[in-house]
Every structure is written in structure tokens, then in C-alpha cells.
Amino acid sequence: MPKYYCDYCDTFLTHDSPSVRKTHNGGRKHKDNVRMFYQKWMEDQAQKLVDQTARAFATNRMHGAVPRTTMGMAPVPPVGHHPMMGGPPGMPMMAPRPFPGPPVGFPGAPGLAPFPGPPMGLAGPPGMPPMMPRPPQQFRPM
């Protein structure tokens, strides 16, 4: 008769029957062993990630990493690029815009519609936020 081996508990069960496996899997020791197995696995995965990150920083190969500069100094532009250049070589130089304008996504940004909102001048009843429905009013019979 084949025996059932539990990898978590490192033991053989006496019988390979569903009821024996179910009883074993419901036991406290088995559940503790499973919990410890996955906790150790998660710690190993976290350590691997830390090691990979440390190795990447050591070799300076982090994708999107900002070049290291001395405190207070601006980063040096790439070779062959001048801050006032207009674009690729052979293209005419263009003067920078005097005021860049609002960031993209804010009202007034070029090429974007304004944010939806309540029309100006439509205030709600006193003590309530704008555009809230008015509370029901009671009418006096005449």
C-alpha cells in the first residue's frame, strides 16, 4: 500500500486515503508547518529583491536613476546639447517661451477643455454646499 508523504511536515502518513490526508491537513502541527514554510519563502523572496537592488545600485545600472551630482550643483546636460539650442543640428534656434503657462491638466492649459464643474453663480441654499438639491418646502394652505 503506497504511503502519502507530506512535504511541509517531512513525514509519511500511515495510509493514502482521503480521510487520513484531510485529518492530517486539518491538524495544528501541519498548519504551523505550512505557515512557517510560506513565511520563510516570503523572507527569501524579499531578501532576493534587496540583493538585486543593492547589486544594481553598486553597478549603477538602475533604470531611470538620476545621475549623482554634488550637493547644490545642477546636473550637467548631456554632451553636445546646449540649453539654448532649438533642437536637432541644422534647425533654427527658437527663443524660449517667456512664461510656460499652467501645467497640463489644470484649467487654462493649452489644448485641454476646462474641468467640469458647476456653472458660476449657481449657489445652493444658505448653509448647504453649491448645487445641492433644496430641501422640501412646506406650503401653507390658503
From Swiss-Prot:
Keyword set includes Disulfide bond: no
Keyword annotations from UniProtKB, A to Z: Metal-binding, Nucleus, Ribonucleoprotein, RNA-binding, Zinc, Zinc-finger
GO BP, one annotated term: spliceosomal snRNP assembly
Annotated SUPFAM superfamilies: beta-beta-alpha zinc fingers (SSF57667)
InterPro entries named in the record: Matrin/U1-C_Znf_C2H2, Matrin/U1-like-C_Znf_C2H2, U1-CZ_Znf_C2H2, U1_snRNP-C, Znf_C2H2_sf
GO cellular component: commitment complex; U1 snRNP; U2-type prespliceosome
Subunit structure and binding partners: U1 snRNP is composed of the 7 core Sm proteins B/B', D1, D2, D3, E, F and G that assemble in a heptameric protein ring on the Sm site of the small nuclear RNA to form the core snRNP, and at least 3 U1 snRNP-specific proteins U1-70K, U1-A and U1-C. U1-C interacts with U1 snRNA and the 5' splice-site region of the pre-mRNA.
Function: Component of the spliceosomal U1 snRNP, which is essential for recognition of the pre-mRNA 5' splice-site and the subsequent assembly of the spliceosome. U1-C is directly involved in initial 5' splice-site recognition for both constitutive and regulated alternative splicing. The interaction with the 5' splice-site seems to precede base-pairing between the pre-mRNA and the U1 snRNA. Stimulates commitment or early (E) complex formation by stabilizing the base pairing of the 5' end of the U1 snRNA and the 5' splice-site region.
Protein name per Swiss-Prot or TrEMBL: U1 small nuclear ribonucleoprotein C
Naturally occurring in which organism (per UniProt): Caenorhabditis briggsae
